[in-house]
Amino acid sequence: MPRGAQPKIAERESRMIYAAIKLFLENGYEQTTTVAIAQAAGMSSSAFFAVFANKEALLLKLTKWMYEKQFAITARLLGEGYEPEMFYAVEPSIQMYIAEKSEALRELYVSSYSYAATANYIHQMATDKLVELFGAMHPQYTRQDFYELELATSGMVRSCSSVMPSTYLL
């Protein structure tokens, strides 16, 4: 790779991600095209594919960032020495809160759980967190056990996120 190419790619990636976030929030993930993202970033549509293989690859990058921030925010809110059960309760609550803020954010969460690469990342990362939080308490559990618990939990969260709670009228 020629000298100076790395910063150029990083700048393009950053511009594409910023444009994508703006468009995803305005139009939703499904309705936003790669052409629209490239245009909003002030680049050609071919420039998009020089940075990301497809729109799902961009979603994966964004999903990784979102979940890293979400975990960091949860830990910061709880402070030092938090109980693992508290983290396990608060983190999905933050997800639900974010998803309830707007239809576009909710759709972005649902999309993240709907595509193979992003869903796999979420499940693997959440499994790692479960092992970190509860592995010492449950030494008899394997990573596979924690993975299956993650699948069950994320299924419930995704089901709740699929429909805006305001549509449930009592």
Predicted regions and their residues:
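Amphipathic alpha-helical packing segments from all-alpha helical-bundle domains
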Residues: Y113-S162
